[in-house]
A protein has these predicted regions:
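Secretory-pathway ectodomains
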Residues: 1-300
């Protein structure tokens, strides 16, 4: 049997040292984004808001992380937390629970095994949630600040199910869309200069997100820029709809939204599959329209 010389032993030792160092580094690697899953009773699970969602045999609640309870017994099963961050709002995107955190992070969690699927940071989201520097911010109570955060978090996160689950995250300066199955950024959009998106007036259908904008500037002729609604979709070009600066949107069903543009123009119905307004019932244009009126509607 050939004996090993000191020189021949060195490469093997080097490999072992490298593997050992790698294992030690992996063992001491910080948990990404402060993630941790706690068993019942490990940490306080007092709710941040009254929001709850049911999925499978679980009831999911917000605060201070994503809290899971047994629907039948009410037993607290697990908590998903992030160090230094508080969960504000959750929505289901397919089988995933998508959470908005107060530090501007968006997280997708699979409730069935509390696996964290992806994290995405949205620029400017945390600042908008806090409303720092806005009129009246210095005089708000802690309760008012938290209520503002909760309202804005709910408006920012817009879940969509078609053609596959995805979410849009809307802030005044930016709209981003993430595909849920892998967290892939599908698009991002910014409004024109001197304009801003309005998350609080934004609505979603099953296949699109409708985002109004408002503008403070004017065009080259000095006239104020009009309001506008942008329709964002995952699998098709976006569309634009002219509207007044104070237009209000209301979801009617999975593929239609009401566009309330004030007493002069009135309320119209928008089809988010066709990307077009439904014609008014009784209008001469009805036979030639691609989008037909659905149900009953008022005569012109």
């Amino acid at each position: 049997m050939r004996s090993l010389s000191p020189r021949s032993v060195l490469p093997g030792l080097a490999v072992l040292l490298v593997l050992g160092a790698g294992a030690a580094a992996h063992a001491n690697k910080p948990v990404p984004f402060g993630d941790r899953v706690d068993e019942p009773g490990v940490a306080d699970a007092s709710p941040v808001s009254a929001q709850s969602l049911a999925t499978g045999n679980l009831e999911l609640r917000v605060g201070p992380g994503l809290e899971a309870y047994d629907q039948a017994t009410g037993e607290h099963l697990w908590s998903y937390r992030r160090e230094g961050a508080t969960a504000l709002h959750l929505a289901m995107a397919g089988e995933s629970a998508v959470v908005v955190w107060d530090d501007g992070m968006i997280t997708s969690v699979r409730p069935s095994d509390h696996a964290v699927r992806w994290h995405r940071a949205v620029p400017g989201l945390a600042d908008w949630l806090r409303a720092d520097g806005e009129p009246g911010a210095d005089t708000r109570t802690d309760t008012e600040r938290r209520d503002t955060e909760l309202e804005r978090a709910a408006a920012a996160l817009q879940p969509v199910t078609e053609p596959e689950p995805w979410v849009a995250v809307v802030t005044p300066a930016l709209t981003m869309a993430f595909r849920d199955r892998d967290g892939d950024l599908r698009f991002n959009a910014r409004p024109l200069a001197d304009c801003s998106y309005d998350p609080l007036r934004t609505v979603h259908s099953d296949n699109a997100v409708l985002v109004p904008r408002s503008c403070t500037g004017g065009n080259s002729a000095g006239r104020p820029l009009p309001g506008l609604i942008t329709g964002f979709r995952l699998d098709a070009p976006n569309w634009l709809l002219n509207a007044g600066p104070n237009v209000l949107l209301h979801r009617l069903d999975g593929h239609r939204a009401a566009v309330d543009d004030g007493p002069v123009i009135g309320t119209r119905t928008f089809d988010t599959v066709q990307g077009a307004l439904e014609p008014v019932c009784g209008s001469p244009a009805v036979p030639f329209e691609a989008v037909k009126p659905e149900g009953t509607c008022s005569k012109p």
